[in-house]
């Protein structure tokens, strides 16, 4: 009997009742009355229908799988039906497998299909091929091959389709199991299939990938012996193999043969695929000069669409980060009176910006005005940031003006990207000028614009200018400030030591604007006050946080622990840990690291070691940074034995030493013999 999942089943006179599966999700609790009524009606219909009504159950299972996309419910129903004597058919099986694959549950789909087979439910040949084709989308050829073998064991007369054979061979070749793929060729012949050009091309590509070029050439010759004419793609794949083996002369000879093949090829898509594969192979193996020769002499491959050929050259060169080479292809196109595709041209500029060639990218952007080229928004952002890092405001401004002329562009967003780039530069005047330009151009700044302006001014130390912008926001000249605005202003004030004004923003300005400070705001203020060595004020703000019913997080505790230790209040930090942090349960490796760092820097190495041991005993998980902090302090104090004890404790608790750990120990044993060091590592208890 076929069992899938447990199902509570209650018999009825004319059918049976499927109990609803338990669900504790919020969605099920808040389900609307209409949906509940519909489910009740379906449930009543299920009770009314007999097991022998196969047409109804086929529609029901298909609806659950295809419409509701709930294969688990379909499996529960099938399980219940099987208990009543129902035998699933090909349509039931196909619906369930397709639904599992749609949900990305390919491993389970493989297992379910095998369970169906083991239970004696063998679908027809067409359904088997459809299911195998769907399982191949999992890109798990070994699992799918196992399913095929089991299926043939149950159904001797079953023969996978040629398409499924070819797809399976291709997937096996991609994981370098070319021998297994070759065995499938013999298997398909034994079952009555004749390999086609796709079969041989796939196999040749697989052998070329594993550098078995002699075998690949034998397969190529065998292909001709079998009366199968190689197509352009077959020859292109073989050329790629010779290029991989650095046999350039043979590769170039075959290229001449390829051009002749392509002239006689009738399938345009096949010629395009062959050319694309050839260009990709050249780029992958570094034969860029050959690509430029082809680009300059396109008459060699005149059977390929010229615009497609140039476009693919550019795309392939950009993919392999040869952006200057791609720009050279553009100049070749222009010399022949052709225009590059906008997407290809955008890819060149984008790649140049990523590789540090923003000036060259800017030059290409200017030249792109000949055919009214505008970069994509993401490329514009990248170019703007690169130019601002080069401190070239003039060129950045020109790019801004170009993008503002782009039809359908979001002008505010274009300005925001420019402002964000200006924040890298120490140029507050330009930031304010952009704000004025937006107002003069009937482009109203939004919250993101003003937050960017205030953040940039604060980073440049122009907090007074930021406060003026904030005043304009509060008086209604701009949009009202939000929590991000005020948090940024408070951080800027604290960075300049203006703690009283920052506290005024927290305690007066935020409530006046009906903004409730969150944990991020409190964390920023507490951090700033501790940096100003105002520990009492910082702890007072923490008290406000608790009174305001704002839940402190691990970042809050890490800031406070670090601040108390820096201000030489280690005893207070210990008490805060015992009374507040540990009982709260909100502590992580950042809090542990802050406490350990503070203890070590304050000369409490023994307490740091005990704290580290207590954490592990309490079930907490200190990370490698925590252990490295204590080991580093032991090293500075010349305590070799203690350092290796911490190392051993680190390993016992499942943490592996990293490069920093070994660098610390290397400094500790700079003058020791290597054999002594190995003895210490293997047996730390006897070291000293």
UniProtKB/Swiss-Prot annotation:
Q: By its UniProt entry, which Pfam families does this protein fall under?
A: PPR (PF01535), PPR_1 (PF12854), PPR_2 (PF13041)
This protein's source sits in the domain of life called Eukaryota
| UniProt keyword Repeat present | yes
Keywords assigned: Repeat
Start and end residues of the PPR repeats are 53-88, 89-123, 124-158, 161-195, 196-230, 231-261, 271-305, 306-340, 341-375, 376-406, 411-445, 446-480, 482-517, 518-552, 553-583, 588-622, 623-657
Give the family from UniProt.
Answer: Belongs to the PPR family. P subfamily.
Know the name of this protein?
Pentatricopeptide repeat-containing protein At3g18020
The organism's lineage is:
Eukaryota, Viridiplantae, Streptophyta, Embryophyta, Tracheophyta
């Amino acid at each position: 009997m076929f069992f899938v999942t447990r199902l509570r089943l209650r018999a009825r006179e004319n059918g049976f009742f499927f109990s609803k599966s338990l669900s504790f999700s919020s969605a099920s609790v808040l389900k609307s009355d209409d949906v509940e009524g519909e489910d009740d009606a379906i449930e009543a219909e299920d009770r009314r229908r007999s097991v022998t009504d196969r047409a109804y159950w086929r529609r029901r299972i298909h609806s659950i799988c295809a419409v509701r996309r709930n294969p688990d419910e379909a499996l529960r129903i099938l399980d219940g039906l099987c208990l009543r004597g129902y035998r699933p058919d090909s349509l039931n099986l196909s619906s369930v497998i397709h639904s599992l694959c749609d949900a990305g549950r390919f491993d389970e789909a493989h297992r379910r299909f095998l369970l169906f087979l083991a239970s004696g439910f063998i679908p027809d040949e067409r359904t088997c091929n459809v299911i195998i084709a769907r399982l191949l989308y999992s890109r798990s050829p070994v699992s799918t091959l196992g399913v095929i073998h089991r299926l043939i064991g149950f159904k001797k007369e079953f023969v996978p389709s040629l398409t499924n054979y070819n797809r399976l061979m291709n997937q096996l070749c991609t994981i370098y199991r070319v021998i297994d793929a070759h065995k499938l060729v013999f298997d398909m012949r034994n079952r009555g299939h004749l390999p086609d050009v796709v079969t041989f091309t796939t196999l040749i590509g697989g052998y070329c990938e594993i550098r078995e070029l002699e075998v690949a050439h034998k397969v190529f010759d065998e292909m001709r012996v079998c009366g199968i004419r190689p197509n352009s793609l077959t020859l292109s794949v073989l050329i790629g193999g010779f290029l991989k083996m650095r046999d350039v002369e043979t590769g170039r000879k075959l290229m001449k043969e390829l051009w002749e093949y392509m002239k006689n090829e009738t399938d345009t898509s096949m010629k395009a695929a062959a050319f694309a594969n050839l260009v990709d192979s050249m780029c992958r193996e570094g034969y860029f000069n050959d690509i430029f020769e082809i680009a300059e002499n396109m008459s060699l491959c005149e059977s390929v669409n010229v615009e497609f050929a140039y476009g693919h050259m550019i795309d392939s060169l950009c993919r392999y980060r040869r952006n200057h080479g791609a720009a050279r292809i553009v100049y070749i196109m222009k010399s022949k009176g052709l225009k590059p595709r906008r997407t290809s041209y955008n890819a060149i500029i984008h790649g140049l910006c990523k590789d540090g060639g923003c000036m060259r990218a800017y030059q290409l952007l200017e030249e792109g005005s000949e055919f009214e080229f505008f970069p994509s928004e993401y490329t514009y952002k990248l170019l703007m940031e690169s130019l601002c890092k080069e401190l070239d405001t003039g060129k950045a401004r020109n790019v801004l003006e170009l993008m503002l002329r782009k039809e359908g562009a979001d002008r505010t967003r274009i300005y925001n990207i420019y402002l964000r780039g200006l924040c890298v530069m120490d140029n507050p005047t330009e930031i304010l000028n952009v704000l004025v330009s937006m107002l003069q151009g009937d482009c109203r700044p939004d919250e993101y614009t003003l937050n960017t302006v205030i953040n940039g001014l604060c980073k440049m130390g122009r907090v007074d200018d930021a406060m003026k912008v904030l005043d304009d926001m509060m008086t209604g000249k701009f949009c009202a400030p939000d929590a991000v605005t005020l948090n940024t202003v408070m951080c800027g004030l604290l960075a300049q030591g203006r703690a009283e004004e920052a506290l005024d923003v927290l305690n007066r300005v935020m409530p006046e604007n009906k903004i409730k400070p969150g944990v991020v705001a409190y964390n920023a203020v507490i951090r700033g006050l501790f940096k100003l060595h105002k520990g009492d004020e910082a702890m007072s703000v923490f008290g406000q946080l608790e009174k305001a019913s704002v839940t402190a997080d691990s970042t809050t505790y890490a800031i406070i622990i670090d601040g108390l230790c820096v201000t030489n209040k280690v005893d207070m930090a210990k008490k805060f840990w015992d009374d507040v942090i540990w009982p709260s349960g909100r502590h992580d490796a950042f809090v542990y690291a802050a406490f350990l760092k503070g203890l070590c820097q304050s000369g409490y190495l023994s307490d740091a070691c005990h704290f580290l041991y207590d954490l592990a005993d309490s079930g907490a998980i200190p990370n490698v940074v925590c252990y490295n902090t204590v080991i580093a302090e032991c090293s500075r104090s010349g305590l070799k034995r203690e350092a290796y004890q911490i190392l051993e404790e680190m390993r016992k608790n499942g943490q592996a030493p990293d490069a920093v750990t070994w660098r610390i120990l290397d400094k500790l044993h700079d003058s020791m013999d290597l054999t002594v060091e190995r003895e210490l590592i293997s047996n730390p208890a006897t070291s000293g």
